[in-house]
Amino acid sequence: RDARDRGAKHIELRQTFLGNCETGKGEDWRPVIGNFQSLVDGFPDLSFNLAIAMPCLSGGVDPKGEMFQQALTAAKVVGREAPHLRLVDPAPQDKVWERPGDIPEEALSVADLAREAAAQGITLSVENSGQSIGAIALLVAKCREQLSEEEGKLLGVCPDPTNQIRRQPDTDALGDLEAMPLDMFKIVHFKQVRDGQALLDVDDGDMDCARMVQILDSKGYTGPAIFEIPSHQDVFENLSKSFAYVEGLS
């Protein structure tokens, strides 16, 4: 409610921050579907997506397994007519993929997850964490080769340039963002670090937010943007500051 009152239009519901809408941890995590329904019914003027961590780059997710199927069900509930499930694999990666041949076979199992999600009308996006934005874009392009055109359209990337700046500092995060085709953008993340340390709001720092906004504007991106604001007693004030800062860059 506070986020909406400060101008938020879209909320990402993130695993481990869901209160009575989730139970269990790790492989035992499950959504509480009825509570999700009650939550979104209370905010008809907001849109939502669901975000969960899964070992999707190591082939460790069964598309027919209970956890993934439950996540898809929850995504449909919270996303209403435009369901969207965002995945992130938090496991560290040995090296950044620079060409399609670098991608291990097990990572291509994302195509199976995308096919299952698409069969239920759900957009599936993969966030860059242990890999760069460019590497995840390579993965999506490779997986799309295994999918129908309609299935492929529902698979994309959740780019987070700040993740890349922190974890792959020798790469060009915003260059990767600019190179990615518009149809791969499903949702974007804004957050900021300064001298490698997370800030409490989005402001000037190591990530060039002005260039990020310029790239998104030049591409014609109109999808949701998520502001990742660390927990703090002034979290909603920090959210308002972040909105104002980024809006001032356009």
Regions found by a protein language model. Give the residues of each.
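Acidic (Asp/Glu)-rich catalytic clusters
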Residues: 1-7, 26-49, 67-82, 114-119, ...
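Structural motif corresponding to the early beta-alpha repeats
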Residues: 2-105, 163, 194-196, 231-232
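Acidic/histidine-rich catalytic cores of soluble enzymes
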Residues: 10, 111-206, 211
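Hydrophobic faces of well-ordered beta-strands that scaffold small-molecule active sites
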Residues: 11-13, 48-52, 83-87, 124-126, ...
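Short glycine-/acidic-enriched loop or helix-start segments at secondary-structure transitions
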Residues: 22-23, 135-136, 236
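Charged helix-capping and loop-helix junction motifs
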Residues: 26-34, 64-70, 99-110, 169-178, ...
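A short, acidic, flexible beta-alpha connecting loop/helix-capping segment that sits on the rim
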Residues: 226-237
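C-terminal helical cap(s) of enzyme catalytic domains, especially alpha/beta-barrels
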Residues: 235-250
